[in-house]
UniProtKB/Swiss-Prot annotation:
Cofactor: Mg(2+)
Record text on subunit structure and interactions: Tetramer of two alpha and two beta subunits.
Highest taxon above the source species: Bacteria
Keywords tagged on the record: Aminoacyl-tRNA synthetase, ATP-binding, Cytoplasm, Ligase, Magnesium, Metal-binding, Nucleotide-binding, Protein biosynthesis
PROSITE patterns: AA_TRNA_LIGASE_II
Keyword Lipid metabolism: no
Keyword Cytoplasm: yes
Gene Ontology CC entries for this record: cytoplasm
A Pfam entry, by short name: tRNA-synt_2d
Protein name as catalogued: Phenylalanine--tRNA ligase alpha subunit
Cofactor details (free text): Binds 2 magnesium ions per tetramer.
GO terms, molecular function: ATP binding; magnesium ion binding; phenylalanine-tRNA ligase activity; tRNA binding
Amino acid sequence: MSDLAALQHTILADIAAASDEAALEAVRVAALGKKGAISALLATLGKMSPEERKTEGAAINLAKMVVTDALAARRELLKNAALDKRLASETIDVTLPLRENPAEQGRIHPLSQVMDELTTIFADMGFAIAEGPDIETDDYNFTKLNFPEGHPAREMHDTFYFNPKQDGSRLLLRTHTSPVQVRTMLSQKPPIRVICPGRTYRSDSDQTHTPMFHQVEGLVIDKGSHLGHLKWILHEFCKAFFEVDNINMRFRPSFFPFTEPSLEVDIQCRRDKGEIRFGEGEDWLEILGCGMVHPNVLTACGIDPEVYQGFAWGMGIDRIAMLKYGMSDLRQLFEADVRWLNHYGFKPLDVPTLAGGLSS
């Protein structure tokens, strides 16, 4: 037993002295390998009497367990030390100046920039962000939004459908972010105040349309909500987003299945040598659609239209990004052209005028 204790002490000392994983592996082989010291002791158990085997076997197995645990602990320690050493050698001095060559500097994509601006503006008004899946059911995308059977938007030339299931139902790529509003109304009790930014899909592609595009929609459900509230929100948004103190807006009657009454919104602008200036001029430019939530939609989502009413609006993020920053072709937003991004993108450390104004 004294020899076993001395052997264990020696092996533990060798483990503690191992300076790297290779040295530690050598100690493991010398102790627990096929020809290792402890393995040799275990091989002698077969020649012992049952009484000796019971006593000696327990002692040898205990020594093996102690050595195994010590090896594991030392290996973990060495691994962490090696990682710390590597990380120390890879330290980046964040006080170093940026690369001077603009081509070597990354850019924030205009769509990411505009999404940040949108969420900042509406968050300042007390809106939360709601999200939902890109793949939707016909029920959430159309039926609960008061789209009757046979509505043109249900046709294959507008909507990307998946193959029918065995029961005949079909999933689809959402054609607007309105299904997120449906999910919100089904899962939350009023009052509700959310915006729903995200990707949407329609079978269309030209200079001003792409099969995948981005939308942001807003929804307010409460007692006593009315068009005056909607107009104020949209007016404040346009002033903040386009960074114009005085902006004139025009609300025109329109039709959307999910709102009644439905309106389209134009803002006053002046077109000058290919540029659009807002807040001046005699031209008008359509930017979004809106209206009071249709009672049928409220009922389909479990909200009593006799108690609550609400309003909603929606706009294309890609479109308003093009209007604000002077981009002429929607398709260029998705072409990953570094030259285009260097021209229209934003430097990561630049503080946008909008966010700067809100933070101060």
